[in-house]
From Swiss-Prot:
One of its GO terms (cellular component) is cell surface. Glycans are attached at residues 148, 183, 249, 418, 545, 573, 721. Residues 1-21 form the signal peptide. It comes from Rattus norvegicus. Residues 29-127, 128-243, 244-339, 340-448, 449-565, 566-666, 667-776 form the Cadherin domain. One of its GO terms (biological process) is marginal zone B cell differentiation. This is Cadherin-17. The chain crosses the membrane at residues 787-807.
Length: 827
């Protein structure tokens, strides 16, 4: 008995402290209300019970009842038939309270019944068969036809969201799809493979079977329908013309038509793209596709031009890939020959025989090479002095080779001859100067001061450019001529070209330097042989002998070198949705000493990657996110296994390619939006959307809609452009309060992402154009005094109840003499 009373006490306490005074969920006073009911539910279900206040005794229901909605005298609102959203999605009713005389004493108030959708309709194609055509080489992804289906279910719910898919392509060659369909719009276009392969000569006809499913195609219980699509492949006349040839420096009036392009259908808008970014682009195109050169061209300035012709629709969107236009500028003879230097100097020994070659004289012509306009002819037109006779020299008419023409020269006759050479092409002539110096005969060979320069030991990390040895040879021929000048060559031992000898022209001293890194592993000991020789040939009977050769031994010591990477930066490109555990790249290094190399990662701050220590293969270990880091950079450390454990580093850059995985959101914080109450006219405000995915060259194209259908009678969202939209009121009958308006934003990506954002709009009294909120108690929020009063009242009621319970318990004890508490204690 006591436990039952305590249980009742607890329930009563909870009721008093927790639920007293709250309005019921399924009943309440007469006021405007909105109810949501799923279609297809069994009839005669109670929706709500309205309570009438005297003198009201009954209710009257009017409006769009359609004979479905009824109300009893006691205020029970119910429906008598199954609701069908496709017949009527929203029922607007009026409910009034009547007195016993049938007069309205309260209301009428609006009652809105929203019929919620269920998936009870199958999507249906508008046609059982579609026909379309596409040009070969059309731009992939550009729609050339659409298939359309309808579904009577609510398009704002998954029930009415359609998903298109190509299920069969005939013929399907090599299992390659040539066509693709936009899953949401039904737009059919070519795949990249189809753009390249389709040929009306090989296969002019294709058939597709296309299906459409509701529930976004994501539910196994979704309904579907199919249709047939016949596609004809037509020839594409949007082709690049043959390369054009234009003679330079044309004097005809410009512009001059040089070629033409043509789109497959009328109405295209043509333009040219200056691919090479020339400051003055000398070409233009008209709207017939005719391409013109607008000014004379200069081949010596630019011998060819490459640019693109594009065709766009009336909205400025490309109809296909641009065509490459190639123009070759044909040479004319508009440049005279030029001398390579003010004076060309040759040397000849005084004992040279008749016909000996002195040198090759050359000039230059800026006209096109290997063309008649640039073929040069040489002729000697003057000699100074003419001693011992004129015409001592000959020159090859086309080769420019200068030879002795009559006899050997003597320095005592003249140490120098000045020749004038006429250089000509088919139209122009130029005079150039040639100086021939007569030098002593080369009858002395260079002689090394030492034949053996000993040996030297160097570490393999000796710096490039270091001088490791100085060698010296002498020549007794005439100083500062080609007969006495010494050139040093390494004729034995340096097969890899790691060394070089640089000669001082004043002293003929040779400096042996390191040209490439030394390598102990391939050449630990090298025997080097040097040769000293003259640029001028030796006279007959004189030959280089052992005096012109010297030797040197180079020993290279080992240096424990770090592992070597073939490159300092390794890069791989992967999609950001790459699965965990996927191999994303490989890094390799080689140890010069042949030791095994172990790999590890450094600066792997996000822990996205791991590396196989043996192979250098790199794998993903966590979800990748381009919005967090578009290029993830880590260091790869290669360490010797054994030895001195030396290490080296390289960089691995993982470039993350974007997938559409971020829903749209508001571009900034839109708190503080308000309208002055009351509205004198419908108002509007503008907001901007963005998302965190990588944006293409074209700006994003978001679509906007209200997040709830019930808001459509009060609000409207209209798109301004791809990123901005306008939220507008549809009337002025708003209460002075805060409205939270959900906005549905779709990015139209692949796959599409949707986000629901909320705009809080306040309707308030305004002072000087700003929202005015007077200080004071707000309706519905209790004051401190009210809270204290409620607590005191609650505790008072609890105290009374406790007192009643304990009195009752005491009374029960008195009435029960067998109770242990009523028996006297025994001593």
């Amino acid at each position: 008995m006591v436990s039952a009373q305590l249980h009742f006490l607890c329930l009563l306490t909870l009721y008093l402290t927790g639920a007293y005074g709250q309005e019921g969920k399924f009943s309440g006073p007469l006021k405007p209300m909105t109810f949501s009911i799923f279609e297809g539910q069994e009839p005669s279900q109670i929706i709500f019970q309205f309570k009438a206040n005297p003198p009201a005794v009954t209710f009257e229901l009017t409006g769009e009842t359609d004979g479905i909605f009824k109300i009893e005298k006691d205020g029970l609102l119910y429906h008598t038939r199954v609701l069908d959203r496709e017949t009527r999605a929203v029922h607007h009713l009026q409910l009034a309270a009547l007195d016993s005389q049938g007069a309205i004493v309260d209301g009428p108030v609006p009652i809105i019944i929203e019929v919620k959708d269920i998936n009870d309709n199958r999507p249906t194609f508008l046609q059982t068969k579609y026909e379309g055509s596409v040009r070969q080489n059309s731009r992939p992804g550009k729609p050339f036809m659409y298939v359309n289906a309808t579904d009577l279910d609510d398009p704002a719910t998954p029930n009415g969201q359609l998903f298109y898919q190509i299920v069969i392509q005939l013929p399907k060659i090599n299992n390659v799809m040539y066509f693709q369909i936009d899953n949401k719009t039904g737009a059919i276009s070519l795949t990249p493979e189809g753009s390249q392969v389709l040929d009306p000569i090989k296969n002019p006809y294709y058939n597709l079977v296309v299906s459409v499913k509701d529930m976004g195609g994501q539910n196994e219980n979704s309904f579907s329908d199919t249709t047939s699509v016949d596609i004809t492949v037509r020839e594409n006349i949007w082709k690049a013309p043959e390369p054009v040839e234009i003679r330079e420096n044309l004097t005809d009036p410009h512009p001059i038509k040089i070629t033409q392009v043509q789109w497959n259908d009328p109405g295209a808008h043509y333009s040219l793209i200056n691919k090479e970014k020339l400051p003055q682009f000398p070409f233009s195109i008209d709207q017939e596709g005719n391409i013109y050169v607008t000014q004379p061209l200069d081949r010596e300035e630019k011998d060819s031009h490459v640019f693109f012709a594009t065709a766009k629709d009336e909205n400025g969107k490309p109809l296909a890939y641009p065509l490459e236009i190639r123009v070759k500028v044909i040479d004319i003879n508009d440049n005279p020959p030029t001398c390579l230097s003010q004076v060309t100097v040759f040397e000849v020994q005084e004992n040279e025989v008749l016909g000996s070659s002195i040198g090759i004289f050359a000039a230059h012509d800026m006209d096109e090479a290997n063309n008649i306009n640039s073929i040069l002819k040489y002729r000697l037109v003057d000699q100074t002095p003419k001693v011992p006779s004129d015409e001592l020299f000959l020159i090859d008419e086309y080769g420019g080779k200068v030879q002795l023409g009559k006899r050997s020269l003597k320095k005592q006759d003249s140490p120098q001859y000045n020749l004038t050479v006429e250089v000509s092409d088919i139209d122009f002539k130029t005079l150039c100067s040639l100086q021939v110096n007569v030098i002593d005969i080369n009858d002395q060979i260079p002689i090394f001061e030492r034949s053996d320069y000993g040996s030297k030991t160097l570490s393999e990390d000796t710096a490039i450019g270091s001088t490791i040895l100085i060698i010296q040879a002498t020549d007794d021929d005439e100083p500062f001529t080609g007969s006495s000048k010494i050139l040093y060559k390494i004729v034995q031992g340096d097969t890899e070209g790691r060394l070089e000898v640089v000669t001082d022209p004043m002293t003929n001293t040779g400096y042996v330097k390191i040209r490439k890194p030394l390598d102990f592993e391939t050449e630990p000991v090298t025997s080097i042989v040097f040769k000293a020789e003259n640029p001028e040939p030796l006279v007959n009977g004189i030959e280089y002998n052992a005096s012109s050769f010297a030797s040197f031994e180079l020993t290279v010591t080992d240096v424990n070198e770090v592992p070597v990477f073939p490159q300092q930066i390794f890069q791989a490109n992967v999609s950001e949705d790459t699965a965990i555990g996927t191999k994303v790249g490989t890094v390799t290094a080689r140890d010069p000493e042949g030791l095994t190399v172990s790999y590890s990662l450094k600066d792997n701050k996000r822990g996205w990657l791991k590396i196989d220590s043996v192979t250098g293969d790199i794998f993903s270990t966590a979800p990748l996110d381009r919005e967090t880091e578009s290029v993830y950079r880590v260091q790869v450390v290669a360490t010797e296994v054994g030895g001195s454990s030396l290490s080296s580093t390289a960089y691995f850059h993982l470039v993350l390619m974007d997938v559409n995985d971020n829903p749209p959101r508001l571009a900034k914080d839109y708190t503080g939006l308000f309208f002055c109450h009351p509205l004198s006219a419908p108002g509007s405000l503008i907001f901007e959307a963005t998302d965190d995915d990588q944006q293409s060259v074209r700006r994003p194209k978001f679509t906007f809609a209200l997040g709830r259908e019930s808001l459509q009678s009060d609000w409207e969202v209209s798109k301004i452009n791809g990123t901005h939209a306008r939220l507008s009121t549809k009337h002025t009958r708003f209460e002075e309060q805060v409205y939270d308006i959900p906005i549905l934003i779709n990015d139209g990506g692949q796959p599409p992402m949707e986000g629901i954002v909320s705009l809080s709009v306040t309707f308030c009294q305004c002072v000087d154009g700003s929202c005015f909120r007077p200080a004071g108690n707000q309706v519905g929020i209790p004051t401190v005094g009210m809270a204290v009063g409620i607590l005191l009242t609650t505790f008072l009621v609890i105290g009374i109840i406790l007192a009643v319970v304990f009195i009752r318990m005491r009374k029960d004890k008195v009435e029960d003499p067998q109770s242990p508490e009523n028996k006297p204690l025994r001593s």
